[in-house]
């Protein structure tokens, strides 16, 4: 599964995962990138989802030509999805104390300056 979210400012949040034996494994770490410079993924049969596929359809289909078998439109991330990814990690004893948990920011710069617009 290739997840691409429109990050605005001409960029996307991109990550790829594969499910094996009921557990999701990261193939491509979450990253902020230009739709023209996407991570290379091996193989075929990928399913794409997220607002990035709506915003940058041509660039994503061109980059992954022949690799994506289906794009699911109208899917947005939800906390329950993250919880399902975290559960196996927690069960393996790799959880962290809630007081130490912190958000993972992919983009530090959240707005363009006036002269950059």
Residue ranges of model-derived segments:
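Surface "functional belts" at beta-alpha junctions
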Residues: 1-76, 105, 110-111
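Acyltransferase
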Residues: 70-117
């Amino acid at each position: 599964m290739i997840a691409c979210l429109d990050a605005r400012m001409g960029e996307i949040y991109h990550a790829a995962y594969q499910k094996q034996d009921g557990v999701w494994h990261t193939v491509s770490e979450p990253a902020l990138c230009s739709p023209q410079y996407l991570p290379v993924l091996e193989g075929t049969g990928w399913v794409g989802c997220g607002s990035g596929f709506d915003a940058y359809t041509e660039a994503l289909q061109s980059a992954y030509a022949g690799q994506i078998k289906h794009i699911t439109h109208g899917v947005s991330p939800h906390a329950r999805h993250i919880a399902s990814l975290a559960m196996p990690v927690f069960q393996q004893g790799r959880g962290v104390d809630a007081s130490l948990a912190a958000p993972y920011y992919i983009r530090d710069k959240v707005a363009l300056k006036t002269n950059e617009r």
